């Protein structure tokens, strides 16, 4: 154990070095945070001490940040052995040019940049422009050339298998720098050209390069230096090093020589990873316990669609000057908060205000270079890792509380940082069965020094433009030291976000920082609203709209109309039509009877029975008598109806129609008896608009119905607004479809009669028959509808030409789909269409949005918006914290004003919960989720009670339905979770395009929502079921979907076995890499749901490329395909000869099932043994007993197995085929190589009695064509007939000697094979493969190098030259030279492809050869 006093001095010196101060300036008992130590430096200390074998963790150090406390911790923790690191030795030089592993962050960038990835399609990219003067192009080029030699990572190449290599330096070649000379160009043209350069470079993916410099020469000796870096090659700290070195080299100063390379660093880290890692393992276990509870990333408001580029990034920035920075950090340190966490907390606060939840995952990159060599800090490369913070700001109402919460989250996560954030994300993805991203990033570069050192700005000028972006990153908030202060900037994919969101968020963060810097009180004061003043003003203006109330009760307008126009029609019904006078008389009769039965003012009367025209008189009579009506329809189950009667405190009951079966515990009147009795005199008393008018019972979340009490004045606000908005009058006729229990009936009755119009009653027998509705509209020339969306959908299905009389159609109560407006316009061109929002508690409706141009509604609209509040009403969208949500942020819709209910009958607790006081007024909490648009329009986005948990994600079913309805061909959708305790999403969809399928819907949906929001099951229905009240019947939808899934036997996507050899091979590769049994991986199972991630996907792709000869496969394809079935389809679709893949897969499966000894003994699978007249290494593929055969000669290094597929294609054409095996490979590996081509040909000729198979057709590829030519000469001299020689991609014999020497070194031989295109670079990583390949190729090259043939040497056989039209080695002219070597017929043919065109055209070539044989 280290002595505590000595330890204290050591720690003091290390901390002083990090802070850049004298050791004696640090008091052992002082809080180090207060003296400038931040979390980044603290984490570097942890890493440094752990590598020395000292058992410390970040959380413990952060809890007691003093030298005294740390000395005790360190001295107590020195018993752990330091981590051993393998010495790289001279590997950096001896293996120059060889591939080496990428770092985890490099791999993430490499995978994420592919188009098929979520938030992919972009590179990790940093682009900076320096505006300076007199930068010299030649000096810059010379400096850049030396820079590229100094830092090999500037030459790095990222290979398709997910590794990287640094090719040898290109000798004296200068680093390429493009120079644009605009010194003599007009100013406006200069601006245009500079803008064009910026536009092109700022978001480019560098092709084949990772570092690019360009210089623009400007008038007045000004210059602009454009610096572009692919951050897959170099991290942010490396960028500082690059520019500092470039500036020094430009100035003629040589930086100190480097004795270490990034390649060596990565090799050392990889070696360390292979050793036992007890700290990492413990941290992995710690994270594993928390994976199920980790939150989602921030759910920020995104753009539904539009033309904006969703890949391009924009920047927001603010510079905190030194005074502001010092004040802010001093106040933070006084509270024990580090500067980095102060800035992080301000960012987290913004995320919480604009996100769906105040708890979320935040991604923190860490810059950590392990001190493996003194030069590590001078290297360029990727040294980053990441940390995931579980940030929870719930209840953190002050800046101090938020900062403490974020700092505590950092301490907790950093205490387990040996298991990096990328690994945690992969584990989280496995747990949830879908890819999980952490696309919101906070990058702190505090403590790394100024972004651009003075030398850089002195040489190249001031940075005038900076932008960065990264794959799978939406928003990167960065803080860095700059120009003596702190630069706070965001690089953000603005096209993804809703308009105005990023500006508002960034402004709020800056305001927060300035507020905290300005005074201590701000830290502990309640936080100001996040609602920008401009947005508040828009809402205040809309909420402030008023209209003078009439001060009348609901029925007053009717009685006035009855006096003014007694003979006008009031009701059209199957039970009989009524004029206003007749209806007034019936209403008076009802009122008189109720009074006679003991009704007092304010008493409640239940109205029971089926829907009829007489009910209009019933409710008018109840209200005229001073009563309150409470309807109970015939659809109510008896038990529920009786509970409503009891809860509703009913005093009397009025039964419309026959006596009901419900037990009514109060005096009851039959409406028929009342209307049949002699008229009784009734004199209405004065009405009270503040009195209750009706009680409507709606469903309760507890299963107990709740009765909503609505006063006359509240309902009158809706009635008066409706009449005023649509300018309704005596000429209008209303179709009254809603039952009395439905609040829509309030408008059907009272708005119609108050305006002097007539009601066309849909009675009980007709209310489920949309064709009957259309007949009524047509017959009575109905002009006004007040409908639920489901009703209008059904009506438009059958409307035909019967709806043209409509002029005012209002739809509300559920999602109002835009297609309803479009379809209505076709059938009723004169109709005005409005969507309304509200609830029974808001007196039917509270908001309105009139569609002005139904034919041109935005295609991304999922629903018609709620719109704006009615006059005298006000709305709020409220977060869980109780604060107003900014524009585009979803929250609960609150409604206040004249048009809200009084509460719930007999439920004071529920009333207090849903009707709340705020700012001196009562607000109703609707439970609807809504958001504001920038113009104050409210959009309905779902119901709070429709939120579900899927794979750990919180999912809003309404968002899925909205996305479905945006798809072409889909006009209705409903999503649900299948019953039975599962978290399986399903959706019912109605389509109007026969070409739309369930699978195409799922595929298209992937462009709109994350994978976890794509329903596993999609069922196409003719119609979405609706309740009688016109809302989606979600219970019925769930039952239908569950029945369909049960019927198809596909509830949980059970195991599906492979059906083809290729699928079997793919399953074997995938299962091996996932560590699963073969039968545990079905062909329709999602790779990532089985536990796959980007790293394992890379391994799968490497395996497929290696074993199935599929070099075109990329990691992005795994993310696009996701299942074995889809992957097999993708691979087959890319093959010109699909059978080839099946053959390759068959060979792979044979090998995969062998032992290693079996593999070595059977590297060349033999179709059948040759006849005894031939050597065993002559492979025969029997096709026919007819005379004549094809003899195949492989290419240099090629084994007989490589031509198995050609042989099988020839056999399929009824041709007997032989393939010869050269020595030094496969089963002839121990045979000595031939000294020359002639000797090889002689050995092959003597390998069998070729007279038995004559006449022969010879086929040779590349070198094999030369061997075949010499074989033909031997055959003809020995009387063996040769019909033809097919020379495939081979030089003519007379041209070989003039071609120059062939490579001899192993490295050059391999490079030559790759260049020819016949050897996948991935295979060269396999040492066993290389060990088998190189000796064979070198033996063949030696034989070929000594070959020479005069141009006049000919054979009698015909020669057919064949090649690929894109073969860069064997040109058309070289193939034509074969003509000089035959005295017979010569032909020349080309196929599309390169040197190994044959792989893509096996069948076509086999047919050509076979036709010649026969």
Swiss-Prot record:
Cofactor entry: pantetheine 4'-phosphate
Top-rank taxon, per record: Bacteria
GO BP term, pick one: amino acid activation for nonribosomal peptide biosynthetic process
Gene: mbtB
Entry EC no(s): 6.3.2.-
Cofactor note: Binds 2 phosphopantetheines covalently.
Cell inner membrane keyword on record: no
Protein name: Phenyloxazoline synthase MbtB
Organismal lineage: Bacteria, Bacillati, Actinomycetota, Actinomycetes, Mycobacteriales
Protein species of origin: Mycobacterium tuberculosis (strain CDC 1551 / Oshkosh)
Pathway: Siderophore biosynthesis; mycobactin biosynthesis
Annotated spans, Thioesterase: 1188-1413
Region (Adenylation): 579-975
Domain Carrier: 5-78, 1057-1135
Record-stated family: Belongs to the ATP-dependent AMP-binding enzyme family. MbtB subfamily.
Keyword Repeat among record annotations: yes
Enzyme class: ligase
A GO CC term attached to the entry: cytoplasm
Domain comment, as recorded: Modular protein that contains an aryl carrier protein (ArCP) domain which bears a phosphopantetheinyl arm to attach the activated salicylic acid, a condensation/cyclization domain involved in the formation of the oxazoline ring, an adenylation domain which activates the serine or threonine residue into an aminoacyl-AMP ester, a peptidyl carrier protein (PCP) domain which bears a phosphopantetheinyl arm to attach the activated serine or threonine, and a terminal thioesterase domain which assists in the transfer of intermediates from MbtB to ACP1 in MbtD.
One term of GO molecular function: ligase activity
PROSITE patterns assigned to the protein according to its UniProt record, in alphabetical order: AMP_BINDING, CARRIER, PHOSPHOPANTETHEINE
């Amino acid at each position: 154990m280290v002595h505590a006093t000595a330890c204290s001095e050591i720690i003091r010196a290390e901390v002083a070095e990090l802070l850049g101060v004298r050791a004696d300036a640090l008091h052992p008992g002082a809080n180090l945070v207060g003296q400038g130590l931040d979390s980044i430096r603290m984490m570097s200390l942890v890493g440094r001490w752990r590598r020395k074998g000292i058992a410390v963790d970040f959380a413990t150090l952060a809890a007691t940040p003093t030298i005294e406390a740390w000395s005790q911790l360190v001295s107590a923790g020195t018993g752990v052995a330091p981590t051993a690191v393998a010495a790289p030795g001279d590997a950096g030089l001896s293996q120059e040019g060889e591939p080496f592993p990428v770092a985890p962050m490099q791999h993430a960038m490499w995978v994420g940049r592919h188009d098929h990835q979520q938030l992919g399609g972009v590179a990790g990219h940093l682009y900076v422009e320096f505006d300076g003067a007199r930068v010299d192009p030649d000096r810059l080029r010379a400096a850049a050339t030396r820079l590229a030699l100094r830092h090999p990572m500037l030459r790095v190449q990222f290979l398709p298998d997910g590794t990287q290599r640094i090719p040898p330096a290109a000798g004296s070649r200068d680093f390429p720098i493009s120079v644009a000379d605009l010194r003599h160009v007009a100013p406006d043209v200069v601006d245009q050209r500079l803008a064009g350069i910026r536009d092109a470079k700022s978001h480019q993916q560098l092709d084949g390069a990772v570092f690019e410099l360009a210089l623009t020469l400007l008038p007045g000796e000004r210059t602009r230096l454009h610096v572009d870096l692919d951050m897959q090659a170099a991290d942010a700290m490396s960028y500082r090093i690059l520019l500092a070195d470039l500036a020094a080299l430009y100035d003629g100063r040589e930086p100190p020589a480097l004795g270490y390379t990034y390649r060596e660093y990565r090799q050392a880290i990889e070696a360390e990873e292979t050793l036992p890692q007890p700290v990492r393992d413990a941290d992995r276990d710690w994270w594993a316990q928390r994976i199920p509870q980790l939150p989602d990333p921030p759910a920020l408001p995104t753009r539904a669609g539009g033309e904006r580029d969703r890949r391009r990034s924009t920047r927001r920035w603010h510079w905190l000057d030194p005074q502001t920075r010092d004040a802010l950090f001093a106040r933070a340190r006084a509270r024990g908060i580090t500067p980095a966490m102060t800035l992080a907390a301000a960012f987290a606060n913004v995320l919480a205000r604009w996100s769906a939840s105040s708890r979320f995952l935040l991604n923190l990159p860490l810059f950590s270079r392990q001190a493996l060599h003194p030069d590590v800090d001078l290297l360029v490369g990727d040294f980053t890792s990441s940390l995931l913070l579980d940030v929870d700001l719930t209840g953190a109402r002050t800046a101090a509380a938020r900062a403490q919460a974020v700092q505590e989250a950092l301490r907790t996560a950093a205490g387990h940082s040996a298991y990096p954030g990328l690994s945690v994300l992969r584990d989280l993805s496995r747990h949830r069965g879908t890819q999980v991203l952490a696309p919101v990033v906070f990058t702190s570069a505090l403590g790394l020094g100024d972004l651009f050192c003075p030398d850089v700005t002195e040489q190249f000028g001031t940075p005038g433009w900076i932008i960065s972006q990264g794959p799978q990153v939406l928003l990167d908030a960065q803080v860095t030291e700059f120009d003596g202060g702190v630069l706070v900037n965001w690089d953000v994919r603005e096209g993804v976000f809703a308009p105005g969101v990023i500006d508002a968020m960034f402004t709020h963060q800056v305001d927060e920082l300035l507020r905290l810097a300005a005074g201590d009180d701000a830290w502990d004061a309640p936080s100001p609203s996040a609602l920008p003043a401009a947005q508040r003003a828009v809402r205040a203006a809309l909420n402030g709209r008023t209209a003078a109330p009439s001060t009348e009760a609901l029925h007053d307008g009717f009685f006035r109309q009855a006096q003014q126009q007694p003979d006008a029609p009031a009701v059209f019904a199957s039970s009989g039509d009524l004029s206003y006078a007749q209806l007034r008389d019936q209403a008076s009769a009802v009122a008189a009877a109720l009074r006679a039965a003991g009704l007092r003012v304010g008493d409640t009367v239940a109205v029971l029975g089926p829907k009829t025209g007489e009910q209009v008189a019933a409710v008018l009579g109840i209200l005229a008598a001073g009563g309150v009506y409470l309807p109970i329809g015939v659809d109510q189950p008896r038990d529920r109806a009786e509970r409503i009667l009891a809860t509703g405190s009913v005093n009397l009951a009025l039964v419309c129609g026959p006596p009901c079966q419900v037990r009514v515990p109060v005096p009851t009147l039959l409406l028929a008896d009342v209307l049949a009795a002699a008229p009784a005199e009734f004199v209405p008393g004065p009405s009270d608009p503040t009195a209750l008018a009706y009680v409507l019972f709606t469903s309760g979340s507890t299963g107990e119905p709740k009765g909503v009490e609505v006063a006359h004045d509240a309902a009158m606000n809706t009635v008066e607004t409706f009449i005023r908005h649509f300018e309704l009058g005596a000429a209008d006729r209303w179709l009254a479809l809603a039952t009395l229990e439905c609040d829509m009936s309030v408008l059907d009755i009272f708005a119609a009669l108050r305006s002097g119009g007539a009601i066309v009653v849909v009675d009980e027998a007709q209310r489920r028959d949309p064709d009957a509705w259309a007949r009524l509209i047509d017959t009575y020339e109905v002009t006004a509808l007040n409908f639920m969306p489901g009703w209008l959908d059904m009506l438009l299905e059958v409307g035909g030409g019967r709806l043209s009389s409509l002029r005012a159609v209002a739809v509300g109560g559920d999602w109002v789909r835009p297609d309803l407006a479009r379809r209505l316009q076709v059938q009723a061109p004169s109709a005005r269409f409005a969507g309304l929002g509200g609830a029974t508690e808001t007196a039917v409706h509270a908001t309105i949005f009139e569609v002005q141009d139904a034919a041109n509604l935005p295609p991304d609209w999922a629903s018609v918006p709620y719109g704006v509040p009615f006059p005298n009403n006000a709305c709020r969208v409220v977060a869980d914290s109780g604060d107003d949500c900014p524009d585009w942020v979803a929250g609960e819709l609150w409604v206040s004003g004249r048009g809200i209910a009084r509460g719930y009958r007999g439920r004071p607790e529920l009333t207090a919960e849903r009707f709340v006081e705020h700012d001196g007024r009562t607000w109703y909490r609707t439970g609807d989720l809504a958001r504001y648009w920038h113009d104050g329009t409210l959009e309905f986005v779902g119901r709070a009670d429709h939120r579900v948990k899927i794979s750990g994600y919180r999912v809003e079913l309404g968002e899925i339905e909205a996305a479905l309805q945006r798809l072409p061909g889909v006009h209705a959708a409903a999503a649900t979770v299948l019953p039975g305790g599962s978290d399986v999403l399903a959706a019912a969809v109605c389509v109007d395009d026969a070409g739309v399928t369930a699978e195409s819907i799922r595929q298209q949906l992937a462009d709109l929502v994350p994978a976890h929001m794509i329903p596993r099951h999609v069922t196409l229905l003719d119609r979405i079921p609706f309740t009688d009240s016109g809302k989606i019947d979600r219970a019925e939808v769930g039952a239908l979907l569950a029945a369909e899934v049960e019927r198809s036997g596909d509830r949980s996507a059970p195991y599906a076995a492979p059906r083809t050899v290729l699928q079997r091979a793919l399953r074997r590769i995938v299962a091996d890499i996932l560590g699963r049994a073969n039968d545990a991986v079905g062909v329709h199972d999602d790779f990532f749901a089985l536990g796959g991630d980007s790293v394992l996907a890379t391994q799968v792709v490497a395996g497929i490329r290696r074993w199935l000869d599929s070099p075109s496969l990329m990691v992005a394809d795994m993310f696009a395909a996701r299942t074995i079935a889809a992957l097999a389809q993708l691979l087959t679709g890319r093959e010109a000869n699909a059978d080839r893949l099946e053959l390759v897969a068959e060979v792979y499966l044979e090998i995969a099932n062998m032992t290693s000894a079996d593999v070595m003994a059977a590297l060349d699978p033999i179709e059948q043994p040759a006849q005894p007249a031939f050597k065993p290494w002559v492979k025969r593929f029997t096709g026919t007993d007819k005379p004549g055969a094809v003899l195949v000669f492989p290419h240099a290094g090629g084994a007989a197995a490589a031509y198995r597929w050609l042989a099988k294609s020839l056999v399929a054409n009824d041709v007997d085929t032989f393939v010869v095996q050269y020595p030094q490979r496969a089963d002839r590996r121990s045979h000595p190589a031939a000294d020359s081509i002639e000797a090889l040909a002689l050995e092959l000729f003597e390998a069998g009695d070729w007279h038995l198979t004559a006449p022969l057709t010879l086929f040779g590829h590349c070198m094999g064509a030369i061997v075949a030519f010499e074989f033909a000469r031997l055959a003809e001299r020995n009387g063996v007939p040769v019909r033809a020689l097919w020379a495939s991609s081979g030089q003519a014999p007379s041209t070989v000697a003039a071609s120059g020497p062939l490579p001899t070194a192993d490295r050059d031989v391999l490079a030559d094979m790759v260049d020819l295109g016949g050897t996948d670079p991935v295979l060269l990583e396999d040492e066993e493969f290389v060990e088998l390949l190189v000796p064979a190729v070198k033996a063949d090259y030696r034989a070929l190098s000594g070959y020479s043939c005069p141009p006049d040497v000919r054979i009698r056989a015909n020669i057919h030259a064949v090649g690929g039209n894109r073969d860069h080695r064997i040109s058309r002219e070289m193939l034509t030279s074969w003509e000089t070597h035959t005295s017979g017929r010569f032909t020349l043919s080309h196929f599309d492809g390169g040197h190994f065109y044959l792989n893509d055209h096996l069948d076509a070539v086999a047919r050509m050869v076979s036709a010649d044989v026969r």
